[in-house]
Amino acid sequence: MTLPRHLCLLPLSLSLLACSTPTPPTMGIAPPAGWQSPTASKAQALPDQRWWKAFASPELDQLIEIARNNSHDLAAAAARVRQAQARAVIAGAPLLPEVQFGLDASRQRLLRGEGNDQLDASSSERTSTSFDANLSASYEIDFWGGLRSARDSALRSLDASRLDRQTVKLTLFGSVADTYLQSLALKEQLRIAQLNLRNAQAVLSLVEARQQSGSSTQLELAQQRSLVAAQQRQLPLLEQQWQDTQVTLATLLGLPVQQLPTSTAAFADLRWPRIASGVPSELLARRPDIAAAEARLAAASANVQVARAALLPKLTLGVEFGSGASTFAQIFDSPYYTLTSGLVAPVFNRGRLRAAQQLAEAEQEELLEAYRTSILAAFADVEKALNATQGVDRQRQWQDQEVEQSRIAFQLAERRYRAGAETLLTVLDTQRSLYQAQDQQARLQLSQLQASVALYKALGGGWQADSPTR
């Protein structure tokens, strides 16, 4: 019998399909030679993995440790890693023979009729008992690498889950540091507001005394009282904002706000760290989110090979050892073995399998673009953090002078007003200028510290690429 022509060509087409392997995608993005910011340091030293200690705050150290042990986000990320580990074990199992053991017992009794070969109504054998034991093993020969690719995909997904956990940890610690710094800054702003309120109340007492003696008008008295009321209004606003940061901080730590440790640190005691940014080409090995995107891309590439292998025949080998008897005592008296082999090739479902391959290839293309996006986003994160560090540093140099000159102006205006040589309007202006300058000074100091946190995070927080999971 002659085979149809298209079936004769099937082995050749399968061989050609098996020999064509997918070309691994390239990154397609060349890192720049250096950072755009002129203040970027090209020192090769990585940030310390305990980067928060650079702020010299024992309270921040304590909060980070609480977050490490208590955070529900970190616990959820760890659970996702365990899920990926289980999937990797499941995906690797088909590479090994599947062995099963069976022990069966059955009993049949003829109720009516003439029976059959085992149950004969004309004899006394109206009941049949059998016992069987068997040990079987089956194994699929991985000719096309589909099973190995499925295992590799699961292992790369496991890598991605572990790297995601590192990203969650870095983000969590950065958020804890940011919120803690904001909390201290609000306490400092509250202290400044209280100090300026006392200054405004002292001027109000002076205006009231001058008004009683006829040296000041009712208008001047109302103006100063308005300024005092405005300063009073700032206090509950700042207290509310500080309470909000406490709630946010407690949530990050996985605690109710009532259990949040009491802070006694002063904002001025914090140290501003200088951070070496290195060069852009090093960033690819420093960021866990980039490594996770790369691992997902590798998993998608392996999935393409799995889809390609599904189009090819599968060869399965099997062996079974067994024995059976009519009594349990003789169950191993009649041993036997069975050898099997099977070849299965898709015929009528090739359209579905082709679509599955196209789906895997499209997912690979999507993850390649996501990988490229993560690289560009990482470069942008560092550039923005460097720009913020440089910009705030330059502003603070002038802000310190503004605070000093505003303080001198207020003191001079107050003395001249007491002497009757200056109007209250000048005193009011210098009071407002001093408060605004001091408040802005605290805000800039916070921005400077938060820019350092952002730069630590942008550089990967001291994380280094480990060898992939094997």
From Swiss-Prot:
Source organism of this protein record: Pseudomonas putida (strain ATCC 47054 / DSM 6125 / CFBP 8728 / NCIMB 11950 / KT2440)
Superkingdom as given in the UniProt entry: Bacteria
Gene transcribed to yield this protein: opmQ
Subunit structure: Part of the tripartite efflux system PvdRT-OpmQ, which is composed of an inner membrane component with both ATPase and permease domains, PvdT, a periplasmic membrane fusion protein, PvdR, and an outer membrane component, OpmQ.
GO cellular component, one term: cell outer membrane
Bilayer topology term: Lipid-anchor
Job of this protein: Part of the tripartite efflux system PvdRT-OpmQ required for the secretion into the extracellular milieu of the siderophore pyoverdine (PVD), which is involved in iron acquisition. The system is responsible for export of newly synthesized PVD after the final steps of biosynthesis have taken place in the periplasm. It is also responsible for recycling of PVD after internalization of ferri-PVD into the periplasm by the outer-membrane receptor FpvA and release of iron from PVD, thus making PVD available for new cycles of iron uptake. Contributes to resistance against ampicillin.
This protein's UniProt keywords: Cell outer membrane, Lipoprotein, Membrane, Palmitate, Signal, Transmembrane, Transmembrane beta strand
Protein name as annotated: Pyoverdine export outer membrane protein OpmQ
